[in-house]
Amino acid sequence: FKEKLYEDFISEVAYTNFNKLATLKASSRTHDEPLRIDELKTSELTRQQIQNIIDKDNKKEVEKRPKMIAAIIDLVDKYKTEKGREPLHVVEMLPWCLDRLLKKKRFDSDCFAKPQHGGDREIHVLEVSMRIVQYHVELFARVVCKYFPSETTCNPDTKDNFVKEHYKSSTEKYNSYSTYSKSADATKWCQGHHTSHFAALYMAVAPEELKPFLINSLSLWPHKSLNFPTTLVSTLLKNMNLKNVSPLYNRFRHEFSTGTGMFSNKNDNKITFKSGMFQGILHTTSSLYHTMIQENMKMLVQNIYSVKMNINPICTVVQGSDDSGMMISVPGNPTKRSMRIAKTMLMWKENVSEHLSVYCSKEKSSIGTHDLIEYNSEWHSRHKIIKPTFRWISACLEVSVTEKFIDRFRIFNGILTQCLEGGASTLECALVQLNQACLHYMLLGFMTQDAAEEMYTEFAYNPDPSLGFFPCDYDIAAGVTGVEFQLYNLYKYTNFGSTLRNKMSTEMSLYYSQDHLPNSMK
């Protein structure tokens, strides 16, 4: 099987090109220069004033991060300067990038906050050399995952079919049967893992030709240089004397102010530290690690049932990164004994996996349910899929920062379409759209300004979305037609676009008299 994995990996690498990496996604900045901060009387300044001074003195921190396409071009130029020729394929740069990182003994990364579900999630952006290394490590993980249909990040069709296939197999094998399921979600996924776990997995399955590359790449992962936002710097400077009971925060603040420990420079936004893995960076590799645990526990459960109870159960597992599920069908009607044994089997994996750094979140897991399983935020009750539309509806009234009203309407309509796709009825979508309209007009000040009545009159005469009028769908097709159809209806049935309509209705005559023709054509 190792020869087959090696052939598949080489084939995938051969089809890789610079276009797959040279995207418009962000790349990390260089971490060569420390942050310039003059002595400030922070007690006399607000946090925002401190922030403005830092941004003024450090222009590079304010600039947008370079795009991957620009970073790839710069890296190719460096390769050409050092090697004396241009790379013919992206894989030629892989050993060169890995050697540079191994000599540096770390890699650079930027960290920033991304709003998500009412809070912030940390997002990490790797430097371009590490991005190339990471891509090929993940590529090998994808090659292996394709041979395990239970892994859903590389086999997305499994998410929709695994419940149906399980019940189909159970019906064909048994006249009557009972099905017990487990929906498990792991907690602290990136904090609990270390790349040594993944290295041990690769040592068992990777071809000998790829082991040096994979092990050296994963050995780099614990050693990082992180650049965090300057907003955190201004917050620390403003609250240097604030009393805090957290020893971790106090240690971080002390090392920040003295330039010791993880900080190489005083009052800097660059730290060097050791940790396991980053959120989302080794996504497929961690999913493969979880697949190893799930598939082994499936074999173990089947063997226990077969040897101890003389039963051949139908067992199905499914997992994708930190999310997992398991279904066991045994012959006969449900009894207390069969339920107790099945739940013990389902709980077994959660107890064993703690020794492999996969910790089950009790709050987000349901173990031992009968004919009911949740996976990827979708509930399956036998052949029926139950989708929680609340997760989309709750996002419908989130307002994004836009420069034009029409952009806001497109975002609103896009989220509304997701509600419809997630299982909401057109009536629900119509009510959500009315709430979006109310929120939009409230943000314009219609509930507080004296000029609201006059604006109502103007909008009734000229419902122009570019001026703030909120277009709505027909109730029967809410979330279906889109903004373009809304604009078409406004153009056709209202005064909106009357000037454009008049211009389009003006036709040029095709008939000319002799007087209209020039002398040369008479």
Spans of model-derived segments:
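Viral RNA-dependent RNA polymerase
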Residues: 1-522
